[in-house]
């Protein structure tokens, strides 16, 4: 999981 993903408002385990 990437913490920066949640920064975009979308938490994707894939990205």
UniProtKB/Swiss-Prot annotation:
A GO term for molecular function: serine-type endopeptidase inhibitor activity
Highest taxon, organism lineage: Eukaryota
Keywords associated with the record: Disulfide bond, Protease inhibitor, Serine protease inhibitor
Similarity field: Belongs to the protease inhibitor I3 (leguminous Kunitz-type inhibitor) family.
Subunit structure: Heterodimer of an 'A' and a 'B' chain linked by a disulfide bond.
Protein task: Inhibits trypsin and alpha-chymotrypsin.
Protein name: Trypsin inhibitor B chain
Organism: Albizia julibrissin
